């Protein structure tokens, strides 16, 4: 059934498999985890896919769903703790970097 929404999880590399799912007619979002650089690459990839696809395929690229595999309490504690941002790999750092990126896209 084509009404399935694909969450395309890739944590270690920004694999471009969203294109495969869109070509098959599925709506798809890429789902990064705790690596900010990979997550930002996935945002750029999704924008590129939308801009360089025909309208039929472009509509299937739904965006990004950030994955957090911790409880809300521990995530929020990390998010508001300044020492968290010294880490290169972190759920909280990834969310913060994605929010910064999204703010640059608002006027597009």
Describe these PLM feature segments.
Residues 1-108:
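Substrate-binding groove of N-acetylhexosamine-processing glycoside hydrolases
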